[in-house]
């Protein structure tokens, strides 16, 4: 699992510990997880963007992958826009998954893979889209980057989140007694910064917001 995390990006870190074989390809499972994450995130973001109104159907129809799915679903005569949206997303997920499976199986056959060692020594990632699907997915990702991730409301929320995290870190690092006792107990052996980072990393969005209010809003009970 750790090796898969280290090799999450196509270009592995050459400084990675030797036990993670930095010069070799990750396992098929790790390669597959990279694509599964991407498929899930892309389509979740399509749904979120349309639901929030930050992007419109008319805008995203400029993306070939979405347009093909939307045309097929719309031809069924469904009147409910919410149902149409959900079925379009499911259609895109299905198309990406099938394309990834077909291309990967072809790559495995071409590379004559019979063992994990064959995967590691293939010299390339064997879990991959064919060039046509890769281009379609890239077009979708470029659209989401330009129209959703850089939407002014998203940028504002991202900046707000950074301020909250900085405030929390400064508060805990400045006065460690504000940390729960079990986290305070780790400080002598691990250091205040490591402990604070771990504590904040384990927070949900809601918990972080509540903690920020408790620490900085004098009207909120601690």
Task: Go through each PLM region and give its residues.
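Histidine-centered, transition-metal-coordinating active-site segments
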Residues: 1-222
């Amino acid at each position: 699992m750790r090796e898969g995390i280290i090799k999450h990006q196509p270009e592995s870190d050459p400084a990675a510990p030797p036990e993670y074989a930095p010069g070799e390809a990750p396992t098929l499972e790790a390669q597959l997880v990279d694509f599964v994450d991407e498929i899930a995130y892309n389509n979740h973001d399509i749904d979120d963007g349309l639901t929030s109104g930050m992007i419109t159907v008319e805008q995203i129809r400029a993306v070939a992958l979405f347009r093909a799915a939307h045309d097929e679903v719309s031809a069924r005569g469904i009147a409910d826009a919410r149902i149409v949206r959900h079925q379009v997303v499911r259609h895109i997920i299905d198309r990406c998954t099938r394309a990834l499976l077909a291309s990967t199986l072809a790559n495995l056959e071409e590379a004559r893979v019979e063992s994990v060692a064959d995967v590691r020594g293939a010299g390339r990632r064997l879990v991959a889209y064919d060039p046509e699907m890769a281009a379609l997915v890239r077009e979708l990702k470029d659209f989401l980057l330009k129209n959703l991730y850089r939407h002014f409301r998203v940028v504002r929320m991202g900046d707000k989140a950074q301020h909250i995290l900085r405030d929390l870190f400064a508060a805990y690092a400045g006065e460690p007694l504000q940390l729960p006792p079990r986290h305070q107990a780790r400080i002598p052996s691990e250091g205040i910064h490591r402990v604070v980072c771990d504590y904040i990393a384990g927070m949900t969005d809601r918990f972080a917001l509540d903690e920020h209010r408790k620490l900085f809003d004098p009207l909120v009970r601690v």
